[in-house]
Structures are given as structure tokens and as C-alpha cells.
Amino acid sequence: MKSITFLFVSLFIWSVSIAQKDTTEVFKAVNALRYALVEKDSGVLKKLLHTDIAFGHSNGWVQTKNDVLKDMKSGYLIYQKIDSQSTAITISKNYATVKERIAVEGSRDGNAFKLNLFVLQLWVKSKSGWQLLSRQSTKL
């Protein structure tokens, strides 16, 4: 009986440890995404953005992976600052839901913007790590 109890306790502790590791990895990926958008790091973005991403903005505009990279390179969409005010992460198997409140400053087609947003992101765990599959923001 003691060995069965020990086994269950060990499995529980192991599963909590795995969940904490995944949460930490997703948190790092979310921070890396913000950094890559501001610093225009296409190498990091190529790794973090899933091939099938739908990158939705608060004005209804939705970008593909190629759109994000092209608009960043051309200077059409520039992020000068992305500050996280709160982040909540929920892990479910190979998926993570991230809810964030952010303050964003930048410009689109030469027009400056300053927004407070609520952002919902869906991340998927792939062989290469966590990748952003879907993102939608709304103005606060």
C-alpha cells in the first residue's frame, strides 16, 4: 500500500514539475516574441511564428507569417514599444493559452499609434519548441 501511495505522489509531483516547465517555456516564448517584434529580429520570429498563424490585430486586420515578416522588413508596421502589464498562461497538453494586457507604441504606414490592448494567444508545442498559432487583440 505504501508503494502505491508513493507511486501516486511521485507521479503527481512529476506532472506538476512538467507543467511548471512548460509554463516557463511559454512565458519565455511570449517575451521573445515581444522582443523580436520591437527589435525586428526576423530569425526569432521565423522560429516562433507557426506556418499557419493567424495574427489578428485590434482593427480587424489579420496577417499571415509571411505578412508579419514582410511588413516588419519594409517598415510598414513598426513596433517601438510593447510593455506587458499582466500575463496569464494556461497549459493543456501541447497547447497553451496566453491572456495578456499590453501597452503598445509604434506606427503603421507612417501613422503613429499608442494602444492599450487585451491579447489572446494560442501557442502549440512543436518539435522546435513553442510556436504561436493564433493571436487576436482588442482595444481596452
Regions found by a protein language model. Name each.
Residues 52-63, 73-78:
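A short gly/proline-enriched turn/hairpin at secondary-structure junctions
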Residues 14-51:
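Short, low-complexity N-terminal intrinsically disordered segments enriched in polar/charged residues
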Residues 33, 45, 53, 68, ...:
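Hydrophobic pocket/interface hotspot
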Residues 72-111:
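Surface-exposed, charged secondary-structure patches
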Residues 116-140:
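Short beta-strand edge/turn micro-motifs at domain boundaries
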Residues 6-14:
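Bacterial N-terminal signal peptides
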Residues 1-5:
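Positively charged n-region of N-terminal signal peptides that target proteins for export
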